[in-house]
């Protein structure tokens, strides 16, 4: 059994490594470098928008900070919600209406609205400090250099909508896949 070992890092689309050993024509080299799918780009080293994979992290932060009561019913808002008119035309949307709107069901239905509300309850200070404790904005201690995960382009959550979007893994949240695996 393997513990705490990275057995493989995968980036797709890929190319045949043997082409480098056998010698590659300039045409093949140019084709690889000009391919719009960028097979030479190491995606596992980059950061990506985590989307719904981030919701359990928000749940853990909310429970740890006491901002979320797992049995509190947030009420069914339908498929679109905004905190108030200060958000202008911006709405958070979700795919499923269900009841009761509690943490367990929000995870089952992957409810963006619930997690946007949860992020607002957590607040920017607790969100920033919790994500910093989880290694955001830090270099991963790994033999291969990885891009740093971030919760904001400026290292600060500056707007309420940004905080709400962070609750469901959107906004300016970017996470390295290896970092996400380590957090889980």
Predicted regions and their residues:
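Beta-lactam-recognizing serine transpeptidase/beta-lactamase-like catalytic domain environment
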Residues: 3-52, 57-184
């Amino acid at each position: 059994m393997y513990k705490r070992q990275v057995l493989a890092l995968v980036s797709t689309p890929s190319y045949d490594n043997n082409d480098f050993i056998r010698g590659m024509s300039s045409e093949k080299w140019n084709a690889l470098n000009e391919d719009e799918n960028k097979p030479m780009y190491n995606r596992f080293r980059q950061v990506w928008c985590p989307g719904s994979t981030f919701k359990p992290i928000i749940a853990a932060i909310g429970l740890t900070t006491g901002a979320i009561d797992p049995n509190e019913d947030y009420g069914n808002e339908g498929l679109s919600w905004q905190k108030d008119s200060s958000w202008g035309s911006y709405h958070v949307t979700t795919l499923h209406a269900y009841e009761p709107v509690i943490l367990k069901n929000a995870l089952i239905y992957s409810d963006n609205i619930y997690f946007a509300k949860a992020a607002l309850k957590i607040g920017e200070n607790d969100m920033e400090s919790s994500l910093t404790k989880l290694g955001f904005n830090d270099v991963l201690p790994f033999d291969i250099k990885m891009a740093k995960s971030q919760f904001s382009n400026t290292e600060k959550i500056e707007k309420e909508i940004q905080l709400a979007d962070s609750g469901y893994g959107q906004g300016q949240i970017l996470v390295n896949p290896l970092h996400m695996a380590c957090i889980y």
